[in-house]
């Protein structure tokens, strides 16, 4: 250009000629895309008949309106067989045209109507002017949606909106079927354009996420008003006027997952227990495993559950409650022994090599650059001093620097919930999270340069413009969360440690937050392992409910395979309620009592078996001790269960046949537990073999007393219990009489059912 401008001829061309006309014409006429829509609109509306309509409109709209203005022209639109129409026709149509039913609008535009309600009932507080530390996070921008995948939603939409279109649609998941049925009913005779309905359904069915700068709440009801609540230098307080199910699902899922991981950690086989609990838990009436498959929430406990189910999860790893994502560099791992300030030897896996990470936590974020056992630079930003300190501690421990290890005072012996020692890195973390004073004092400080937006931080966590902890700076700007939604295949071991394909540990139960929250949706844990979540009373009630629900099978096992019954995991939680010193004695006593019931005529007592069964599950001690009552620890003290008779803990009402445990209903016994008949039947039927249901060929039913007249090997129908009739045969030998009563109970039931 400089060359051209220096020569007079070209200079004249460049400065005097109008810009190339062809280029402009090309620009505005090529392609279907309108290049200047506003201008085009103004220019079109200035014409008399800017709109075209189907010919049928001539029969539906008069040629002139009340003011005598022409509404449409008789001339055809050039190049089509449509009519030219004036904007006045639209006004006429709106005022005088046919009305249509509005019943479907709230149903189709449900998400909009609900948003209006939320805003109407929301409260907007004062506006504050302050620096906003925003970090980009992946957030849900679409309140009130189900969690279907794009493909699942597509199938539902096609089925609802275009049911007659060709194309294979497979509706498999429970949620797909429910939604399809519901929507088909709602949208019968709907006159709204199908395409519009399809768009709106998509909003309702699919989670839409965006990577947005956020300073406050990240649930979808806050994100929908993001433009009203936070600017570059201001924020406006806001309380949403309603909750939406998708936020509730996310929140409840996290709570359920945390509870399950915490519980699984302390069981004999954590992985098997975790899977059993995930499969038997429901959140808001939907199976937890279905939610896990569809819900993209990333949280440590949720990701452990996903990994256990073989689902892919994010490749970032977790340490000290921060999500670490390596942004550059690489390292190899090597075992190394180090000495703490207390001369305790720790075996740590050292990362050798230069690496850079982003660290993102709930209240603080950071950029970390490190080399082998050396922190090079840490830039932190956070909501307050406390949050910034948390991030600094985690980064210092993660750096594995020698001065950090030497700052340990006292012994490291932290254990997890299952009383197992934590690994060395978590030992160090816990130690300094408790008290980081020595760590910060020993770290060292350095003078700092004045850099815009950065200040120093001293060992007592106060800001400074002159000095700072070595390598550490505080920044006004947050560090964005990792934006990629990439998911990787991972493996999980039986102690719930999750590793990527290279063997790096991404997650472990130590990383699961101990924060307790109250779930928004009802979480139903059907697994006996979760009975204790609501305390001792819940364990008591659930144990007895389980026995009553499964009484049919329990009864058979009680008489034929008691050991297997005593070992059932459903009795495990109950043991924690029995005073430690008494467990073995109680168990021995109850087992002996049960054996006598099996051996002695007429002592079979259903209610007593149900009541004492959980006590027999502990390893028994052989002792001659007798008890008239057994103690359980509930409501903060020992309460007694009477061996014979009712008590506030265990109360069976003969009249209603219902059991109440601690005043809570525990269910009804379907059979008649009247001790007499049950015992008498099994007793009287000793010496007889029960063959099956009544057989008319052997004559009318005899009463139990008439049985004694039968000869050995003779068969007869006999009336037992509540008017049931079974076919029996008198045994040919007497030797096997003892085992009869054990099988009698079972056979009677099989014959009757």
From Swiss-Prot:
Q: Which GO terms describe its cellular component?
A: host cell nucleus; virion component
Q: Which InterPro entries match?
A: Flu_PB2_2nd, Flu_PB2_6th, Flu_PB2_C, Flu_PB2_CAP-bd, Flu_PB2_middle, Flu_PB2_N, INV_PB2, PB2_helical
Motif annotated as Nuclear localization signal, chain positions: 730-733
Q: Where in the cell is it found?
A: Virion; Host nucleus
- For this UniProt entry, which residues form the secretion signal? none
**Which protein family is it in?**
Belongs to the influenza viruses PB2 family.
Its quaternary structure? Answer: Influenza RNA polymerase is composed of three subunits: PB1, PB2 and PA. Interacts (via N-terminus) with PB1 (via C-terminus). Interacts with nucleoprotein NP (via N-terminus).
Q: What is this protein called?
A: Polymerase basic protein 2
Q: Which lineage is the organism of this entry classified under, starting from the top rank? A: Viruses, Riboviria, Orthornavirae, Negarnaviricota, Polyploviricotina
Name of encoding gene: PB2
């Amino acid at each position: 250009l400089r060359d051209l401008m220096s020569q007079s001829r070209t200079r004249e061309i460049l400065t005097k000629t109008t810009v190339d006309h062809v280029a402009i014409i090309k620009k505005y006429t090529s392609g279907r895309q309108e290049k200047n829509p506003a201008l085009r609109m103004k220019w079109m509306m200035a014409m008399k008949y800017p709109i075209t309509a189907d010919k049928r409109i001539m029969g539906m709209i008069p040629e002139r309106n009340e003011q005598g203005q022409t509404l449409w022209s008789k001339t055809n639109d050039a190049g089509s067989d449509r009519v030219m129409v004036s904007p006045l026709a639209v006004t006429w149509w709106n005022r005088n045209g046919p009305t249509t039913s509005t019943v479907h609008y709230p149903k189709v535009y449900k998400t909009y109507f609900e948003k209006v309600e939320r805003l109407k009932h929301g409260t907007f507080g004062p506006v504050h002017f302050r620096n906003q530390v925003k970090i980009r996070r992946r957030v849900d921008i679409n309140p009130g949606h189900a969690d279907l995948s794009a493909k699942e939603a597509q199938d539902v939409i096609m089925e609802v909106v275009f049911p007659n279109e060709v194309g294979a649609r497979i509706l498999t998941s429970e949620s797909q079927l429910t939604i399809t049925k519901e929507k088909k009913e709602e949208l019968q005779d709907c006159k709204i354009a199908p395409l519009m309905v399809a768009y709106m359904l998509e909003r309702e069915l699919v989670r839409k996420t965006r990577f947005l700068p956020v300073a406050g709440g990240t649930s979808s009801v806050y994100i929908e008003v993001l433009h009203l609540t936070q600017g570059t230098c201001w924020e406006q307080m806001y309380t949403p006027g309603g909750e939406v199910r998708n936020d509730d699902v996310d929140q409840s899922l996290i709570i359920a997952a945390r509870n399950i991981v915490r519980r699984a950690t302390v069981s004999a086989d954590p992985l098997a227990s975790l899977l059993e609990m995930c499969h038997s838990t429901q959140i808001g009436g939907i199976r937890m495993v279905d939610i896990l498959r569809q819900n993209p929430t990333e949280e440590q406990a949720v990701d452990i559950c996903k990994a256990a189910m073989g689902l892919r999860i994010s490749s970032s790893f977790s340490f000290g409650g921060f999500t670490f994502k390596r942004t550059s560099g690489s390292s190899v791992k090597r075992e190394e022994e180090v000495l703490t300030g207390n001369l305790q030897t720790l075996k740590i896996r050292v990362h050798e090599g230069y690496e850079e990470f982003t660290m993102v936590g709930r209240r603080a974020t950071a950029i970390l650059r490190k080399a082998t056992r050396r922190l090079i630079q840490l830039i932190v930003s956070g909501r307050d001093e406390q949050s910034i300190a948390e991030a600094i501690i985690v980064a210092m421990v993660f750096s594995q620097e020698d001065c950090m290890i030497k700052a340990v005072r006292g012994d490291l012996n932290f254990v997890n919930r299952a009383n197992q020692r934590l690994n060395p890195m978590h030992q160090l973390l816990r130690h300094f999270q408790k008290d980081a004073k020595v760590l910060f004092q020993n770290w060292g400080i350095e003078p700092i340069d004045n850099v815009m937006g950065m200040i120093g931080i001293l060992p007592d966590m106060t800001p400074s413009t002159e000095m700072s902890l070595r390598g550490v700076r505080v920044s006004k700007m947050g560090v964005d969360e990792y934006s990629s939604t990439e998911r990787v295949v991972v493996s999980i071991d039986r102690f719930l440690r999750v590793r990527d394909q290279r063997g790096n540990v991404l997650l472990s139960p130590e990383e699961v937050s101990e924060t307790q929250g109250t779930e928004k949706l009802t979480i139903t844990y059907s697994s006996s392992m979760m009975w204790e979540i609501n305390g001792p009373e819940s364990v008591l009630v659930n144990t007895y409910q389980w026995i009553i629900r499964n009484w049919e099978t329990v009864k058979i096992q009680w008489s034929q395979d008691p050991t297997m019954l005593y070992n059932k995991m459903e009795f495990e939680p109950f043991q924690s309620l029995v005073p430690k010193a008494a467990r073995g004695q109680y168990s021995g006593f109850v087992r002996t009592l049960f054996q006598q019931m099996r051996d002695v005529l007429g002592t079979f007592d259903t209610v007593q078996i149900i009541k004492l069964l959980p006590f027999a599950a502990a390893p028994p001690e052989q002792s001659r001790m007798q008890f008239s009552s057994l103690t359980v620890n509930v409501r903060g003290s020992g309460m007694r269960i009477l061996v014979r008779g009712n008590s506030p803990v265990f109360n069976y009402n003969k009249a209603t046949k219902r059991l109440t445990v601690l005043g809570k209903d525990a269910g009804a016994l379907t059979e008649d537990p009247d001790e007499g008949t049950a015992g008498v039947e099994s007793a009287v039927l000793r010496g007889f073999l029960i063959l099956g249901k009544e057989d008319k060929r052997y004559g009318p039913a005899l009463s139990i007393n008439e049985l004694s007249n039968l000869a050995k090997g003779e068969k007869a129908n006999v009336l037992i219990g509540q008017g049931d009739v079974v076919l029996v045969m008198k045994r040919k030998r007497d030797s096997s009489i003892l085992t009869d009563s054990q099988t009698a109970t079972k056979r009677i039931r099989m014959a009757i059912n």
